[in-house]
Amino acid sequence: MTKKFFPVVRSVWIGLVLFTFSVFMICGCSKKQKAADNTAQKVVRINYQTGTLCAAPVHIAMKKGLFEEELAKIGQKAEYVNVVEGGPTLAELIGSGKVDAGYGLYATQLQAIENGLPISYTSGIHTGCTKYYVRADSDIQSVKDLRGKKIGVPGLADSSVMNLKRKLLDVGIGVTADNNEVEFLAYSSSDLAIALNNGAVDVIGAHDPVATRGELAYGFRKILDTGTDEKFVHEYCCQQFVTHKLLKENPEGAAAVTRALQKASAFVEAEPVEAARIQIENNLVSGDLDFNSKLLDELDFIPSRSLGKKTFEAAAKQLQVAGILKAETDIEKFVKTGYIELPGVPDGYIYDSEKGKYIEITEPRA
């Protein structure tokens, strides 16, 4: 063996040692990074609105710490995103990745979901809350008399439009593009009652508390109430949703916020006066305690995943007939992806006021 060979061997040996050390350091850093990622506390961003009485479940879940409690069980926490009138819409906040979960009028988002809004619903929260009025001197007696009429609504994609179109279909009044026998006009919620009173429209559709306040202030006559009408009385108007990103990256968080909102809804059902007090005292909703609590008491806040899905499916099928959803949309697939069952989430809850405990509803309500 020549002397020249030893430097070569030595160089190779040193190179192997350095390579092995580098691999060890990279693996060690990678493991540390993964450990840091695993221990980092995840945050679920939840939308809420002020001024909306039937948003009571979200308000209660926030103020009674139900979101924090459920998320803390899995080492996570909640943050809240206020959706304000005149600002970015809920759909825009979802699309820009600023909201992970929340609650609202599900029918308002059906077209957006069909067009790619990445959310799925996980539970029905409450029924009712949308009402339709005419002036006291109007010759309109029911939905059957609405052919050729102007209808004021909070928005052309609002659930008040979707619900009424379904009802109009039932009584034979055209609502499709090629046979449209009514005209919907959009107004801000605060201007709806004025528009009806001034004769700019023949009918208005509004959500409480705006609806009932307008009725009392102007003496309007109610022709349809989704809280009592036989078609809608067992259908949810407001439902819980989660984004597809949350479902993919944090399914445990999605389940936690769903349970929290179900519990909060059950609390409102059992304690409407206390729920109204919490809303007013925290400046989440204005108004009188007696007035607000009576409106909450009129609504059905018993949550249900099964009945929520049944509601979603019924609306999707009929709104396709109405031309709201595309004729080529596969409704079965639309429902399957638009409404999901999360592991660890019961069908719903009831709240035992005497014991201060939440009891799981295991049997499907639908």
Describe the role of every protein-language-model region.
Residues D37-N38, R135-I151, V175-A177, K248-E252:
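Flexible hinge/capping segments at coil-to-helix
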Residues T39-A55, Q76-N82, S120, G148-G152, ...:
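Short, well-ordered beta-strand elements
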Residues T39-K42, Q111-T122, L169, R213-T228:
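Ligand-binding "clamshell"
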Residues Y48, T52-V81, G95, Q111-N115, ...:
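Short, polar/charged alpha-helical segment
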Residues C54-A56, A61, V84-I119, K131-Q141, ...:
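Pocket-flanking alpha-helical
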Residues A107, S138, D178-E181, L185, ...:
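Pocket-lining segment of extracytoplasmic ligand-binding domains
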Residues E249-E328:
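Secondary-structure end/capping motifs
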